[in-house]
Amino acid sequence: MAASALRSCLNRDSDRGPDIAHTTALQPVILAGGAGTRLWPLSRADHPKPFLRLDGAQSPFQATVRRLEGLEAAPPMVVCNAAHRFLVAEQLEAIGVTAAAILLEPEGRNTAPAVALAALHARADGVDPVLLALPADHRMDHPAGFRAAVPAAGRAAAEGGLV
C-alpha cells in the first residue's frame, strides 16, 4: 500500500488519480531529523544541532522557518524524530509560527524517506502541492536571494522539473 502511494507521489504524469487536485501551492517541508553527533559535545541526542542557539539569537531550525516569511506558501510541515517533537513545538511557538504538521519519522533514514513521508501526508488531503524541502540546520547568509529564487523554482517544479 505505501509503495503504491509513494509511486503515485513520484510519478507526476501517468499515475495521478482524478481525486488529486492539480495545484501550484508551495508546501515547505523542514527536515529536522538527526542524531546530534556532528557538533558534539554541544550537540547531543536529546538536543541536536538544529535546535542549538549557536549565535545567541535563534536556532538554525528557527532561522530556517523564518526564512519562509514573505513567501506565498502554506505553513511549514516539519519532519523530525519522536524525541524532538517537543523541541520543534517549543521553538515554533517561540517565534510565533504554527506548523501545518509535525511528522514523526519512525526511524531516521536520511532525506529521501523524510521527504516521501511529507509528500504522502501532503497528498492525504487530495491536493498535490509542490514541496520545498529545507534542511533545518543550514546557514544562509542571504535569505533575500533565497526568497527571490523560490517562486521561479516553484513554477519549474509545478511544470514537472526537479529543482
What are these regions (language model features)?
Residues G154-A158:
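Substrate-engagement module of ASCE P-loop NTPases
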Residues E159-V163:
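A short, conserved acidic/glycine-rich loop-to-beta-strand motif
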Residues A2-C9, D13-I30, T37-P41, A45, ...:
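Conserved N-terminal catalytic core of the sugar/cofactor nucleotidyltransferase
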